[in-house]
Amino acid sequence: RQVNAGALAQLTEREREVAGLAAYGMSNHEIAEYLVISPATAKTHISRAMVKLGARDRAQLVALAYQHRLVDPPDPTSPTAP
């Protein structure tokens, strides 16, 4: 799914951050602990990012985060790679 540049520009810094953390596999609770915010706030940021990017679910948000380089893909040569 393509997202126009305007939609990407609408994301706040925090929405980009939580989308990236979700892409790294973190739950809302883990994101909240990492950013020292409440789980409800983490969920709100995820939801708003999904709406702005037109993602129908968290999996699509993660795919869009990688596709539009909100996060870098994991390094397959890393010792922590699956």
Where are these regions (language model features)?
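Short amphipathic helical patch at the helix-1/turn junction of helix-turn-helix
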Residues: 21-23, 40, 66
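Basic, Lys/Arg-enriched C-terminal extension of HTH/homeodomain DNA-binding domains
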Residues: 51-82
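A cross-family signal for key residues in well-ordered alpha-helices
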Residues: 20, 33, 63
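Regulatory hinge/linker segments at domain boundaries
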Residues: 1-21, 72-81
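Intrinsic-disorder/low-complexity peptide segments enriched for small residues
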Residues: 6-9, 33, 59, 68
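Recognition helix of helix-turn-helix DNA-binding domains
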Residues: 25-60
